[in-house]
């Protein structure tokens, strides 16, 4: 069981972390929604305990294990991961607003 202060700090941390990563990737790659597309893949790597090669060698077992782990996530874990997705989406919105107002990043 995760305590409430840890959940609150984790929510803020994931939001700020993925906002920052998304903002930097958006500036460098000039693709506004790159982090919002990459984030679900990052979440699957965070949730999964399988190695990447196991998804190629034995996909049935690996994806079944991943599906089971996704379904067994606690509400706090889902809330933390959703806050990271919100940070990635807000970074895309922020970079679009800055570009529309004439700011050129790199």
Swiss-Prot record:
Major subcellular location class: membrane
Where does it localize?
A: Cell membrane
Q: Which InterPro entries match?
A: YuiB (IPR025917)
**Which GO cellular component terms, listed alphabetically, does the Swiss-Prot or TrEMBL entry include?**
plasma membrane
The answer on whether this UniProt entry bears the keyword Cell membrane reads yes
Transmembrane stretches, by residue range?
Answer: 4-24, 27-47, 78-98
Q: Which UniProt keywords apply?
A: Cell membrane, Membrane, Transmembrane, Transmembrane helix
Superkingdom of source: Bacteria
Topology class, membrane = Multi-pass membrane protein
Q: What is this protein called?
A: Uncharacterized membrane protein YuiB
Q: Identify the species of origin.
A: Bacillus subtilis (strain 168)
